């Protein structure tokens, strides 16, 4: 499974490079195309694990004035 992250930045928020560094520290990799970052689980995961990652993303981006969308497939 993979979790994809799409980001929307504000000119009043944190610089995109700093946001990307934070997300990379969590295990996300920047990509090009439809999504901005991907987290590769390398296997099937339970819903509670996905929700735990979503909570971590939320806390990491808090205060950075970044909107985001998470999709796991």
Where are the model-predicted features located?
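Long, contiguous binding/interaction regions
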Residues: 1-4, 10-73
């Amino acid at each position: 499974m993979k979790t994809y992250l799409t980001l929307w930045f504000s000119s009043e928020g944190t610089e995109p490079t700093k946001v990307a560094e934070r997300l990379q520290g969590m295990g996300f990799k920047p990509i090009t195309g439809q999504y901005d970052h991907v987290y590769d689980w390398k296997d099937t995961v339970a819903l509670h694990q996905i929700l735990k990652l979503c909570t971590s993303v939320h806390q990491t981006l808090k205060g950075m004035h970044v909107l985001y969308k998470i999709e796991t497939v």
